[in-house]
Amino acid sequence: MKQEIQKGDVATLSFEQALKQLEVIVENLERGDVPLEQSIDIYERGEALKKHCEKLLKAAEAKVEKIQLSEGGTPEGVEPLDSE
């Protein structure tokens, strides 16, 4: 089933909205029945959506903190989550 790709500013989308649009784009491109010019347009939108999702994930990751425990096992503070 061919799904419509929404237009509009990617920056205003939530992570979930952007991810859903990205999934629709992938489905449409994988089917292979999209004309070349439209494929290029939706591929470019997909790239913008991917970057937006990565930006939102990075921001969420920065908010997550790791609890520091003392030698006795009691919480004594927090530190940023290590990026690996």
From Swiss-Prot:
Principal location: cytoplasm
An example Gene Ontology biological process: DNA catabolic process
Enzyme class, broadest EC rank: hydrolase
One cellular component term from this protein's GO annotations in UniProt: exodeoxyribonuclease VII complex
EC number per UniProt: 3.1.11.6
PANTHER family according to UniProt: EXODEOXYRIBONUCLEASE 7 SMALL SUBUNIT
Disulfide bonding pattern of the chain: none
Name of the featured protein: Exodeoxyribonuclease 7 small subunit
Pfam families assigned: Exonuc_VII_S (PF02609)
Record organism: Bartonella henselae (strain ATCC 49882 / DSM 28221 / CCUG 30454 / Houston 1) (Rochalimaea henselae)
Subunit structure: Heterooligomer composed of large and small subunits.
InterPro entries, A to Z: Exonuc_VII_S, Exonuc_VII_ssu_sf
Chain's gene name: xseB
